[in-house]
């Protein structure tokens, strides 16, 4: 399977962080808007915004995001950033993407949570008008933040669903702030009416996945701690949970110490619902075409598998049922030309 074919395949992505996926030209434009001086060469800039191929840990990997934070403190910046990430996705035939971000990371200079969400939604709408893509937004609560901060954010965004906000996630330092410390916040999100996905098992603890299952979470990000957990995988599959897999990112953060310790094959063999995602296009120096290529190389993934993974993504997405039907039809049409 050539890179050209992989790029042309229609794709759906569920797990993509806004602040970790800005293109270098976008970062330069955002810095100019914020009067922040950047290194003059892209080679130097990449050292600040792309994590090393091997970091010490997830926490080490997350430090890269601090460089971007000052660039995303105005509505104009957030609107342009959202447009930029959706544009990048559209250029590799991503027909549906959910882009997630944490409002509190853009509230340093006076924006409210609803200000940040509305700005991101405007940027996604701009991209949808210009490119052949459906782009939706998820809000992330930060695990390490106070529960009061997160509850205030939930309160501010509760009425934004009609404008294109479709769901909620908790991201950040999973090791220090495990799933069972978020129970009251997860219940608060559920009461708000937003569907949820959850980072789970990225830091190597299978209990966090089990706890998420106990809370009724039906989509989970990373789930690398499933490796070698036969009973948990069985339960994961039986409960029809969808895995948002992020191979390059997990190898970088040592969530998976090697290809062999990545849970894809075990989950695939068990009949699990898999989706392929970038996590952070820039921080991990990747895109979906590169991720698909890695799956072909390491796991022998075939075109018919990619069709199923993308169908999984659309069906598990938080968009409307009518939108899902349209997207599933587009997927089938695209893949039919390769599966004849």
Curated annotation (Swiss-Prot):
Family in the record:
Belongs to the metallo-dependent hydrolases superfamily. Adenosine and AMP deaminases family. Adenosine deaminase subfamily.
Chain sites annotated for binding substrate = 17, 19, 172
Catalysis: reaction(s): adenosine + H2O + H(+) = inosine + NH4(+); 2'-deoxyadenosine + H2O + H(+) = 2'-deoxyinosine + NH4(+)
Q: Which domain of life is it from?
A: Bacteria
Annotated SUPFAM superfamilies: Metallo-dependent hydrolases
CDD domains referenced in this protein's UniProt entry, alphabetically: ADA
Q: Which UniProt keywords apply?
A: Hydrolase, Metal-binding, Nucleotide metabolism, Zinc
Q: Name one GO molecular function term.
A: 2'-deoxyadenosine deaminase activity
Cellular component GO terms, alphabetical: cytosol
Q: Which residues are responsible for catalysis?
A: 202 (proton donor)
Record-marked site positions (Important for catalytic activity): 222
Query: Which Pfam families has this protein been placed in?
Result: A_deaminase
Q: Which cofactor does it need?
A: Zn(2+)
Listed GO biological process terms:
adenosine catabolic process; hypoxanthine salvage; inosine biosynthetic process; nucleotide metabolic process; purine ribonucleoside monophosphate biosynthetic process
Has UniProt tagged this entry with the keyword Metal-binding? Answer: yes
- Fetch the NCBIfam families from UniProt: aden_deam (TIGR01430)
Origin organism of this chain? Streptococcus agalactiae serotype Ia (strain ATCC 27591 / A909 / CDC SS700)
EC?
Answer: 3.5.4.4
Q: Where along this sequence does the record place binding of Zn(2+)?
A: 15, 17, 199, 279
Can you name this protein? Adenosine deaminase
Please state what class of enzyme this protein is: hydrolase
Q: Which InterPro entries match?
A: A_deaminase, A_deaminase_dom, Ado/ade_deaminase, Metal_Hydrolase
């Amino acid at each position: 399977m050539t890179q050209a074919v992989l790029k042309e395949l229609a794709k759906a992505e569920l797990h993509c962080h806004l602040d970790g996926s800005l293109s270098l030209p976008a970062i330069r434009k955002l810095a100019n808007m914020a009067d922040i001086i950047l290194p003059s060469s892209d080679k130097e800039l990449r050292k600040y915004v792309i994590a090393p191929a091997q970091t010490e840990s997830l926490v080490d990997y997350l430090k890269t995001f601090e460089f971007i934070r000052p660039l995303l403190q105005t509505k104009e910046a957030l609107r342009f950033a959202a447009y930029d990430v959706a544009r990048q996705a559209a250029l590799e035939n991503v027909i549906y993407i959910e882009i997630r971000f944490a409002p509190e990371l853009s509230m340093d200079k006076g924006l409210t949570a609803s200000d940040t969400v509305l700005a991101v939604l405007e940027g996604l709408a701009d991209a949808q008008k210009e490119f052949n893509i459906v782009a939706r937004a998820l809000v992330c609560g930060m695990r390490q933040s106070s529960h009061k901060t997160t509850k205030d954010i939930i309160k501010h965004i509760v009425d934004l669903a009609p404008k294109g906000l479709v769901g909620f996630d908790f991201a950040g330092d999973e090791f220090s702030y495990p799933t069972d410390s978020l129970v009251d916040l997860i219940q608060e999100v559920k009461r708000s009416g937003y569907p949820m996905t959850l980072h789970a098992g990225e830091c190597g603890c299978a209990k966090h996945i089990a706890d998420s299952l106990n809370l009724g979470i039906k989509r989970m990000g990373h789930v690398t701690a499933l490796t070698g957990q036969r009973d948990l995988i069985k339960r994961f599959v039986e409960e029809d949970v969808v895995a948002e897999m992020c191979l390059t990112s997990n190898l970088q953060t040592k969530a998976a110490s090697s290809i062999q310790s990545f849970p894809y094959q075990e989950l695939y063999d068990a009949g699990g619902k898999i989706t392929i995602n970038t996590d952070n296009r820039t921080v991990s120096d990747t895109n979906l075409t590169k991720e698909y290529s890695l799956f072909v190389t390491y796991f022998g993934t075939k075109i018919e598998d990619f069709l199923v993974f993308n169908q999984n993504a659309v069906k598990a997405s938080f968009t409307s049922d009518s939108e899902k039907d349209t997207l599933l039809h587009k997927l089938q049409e695209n893949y039919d030309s390769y599966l004849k």
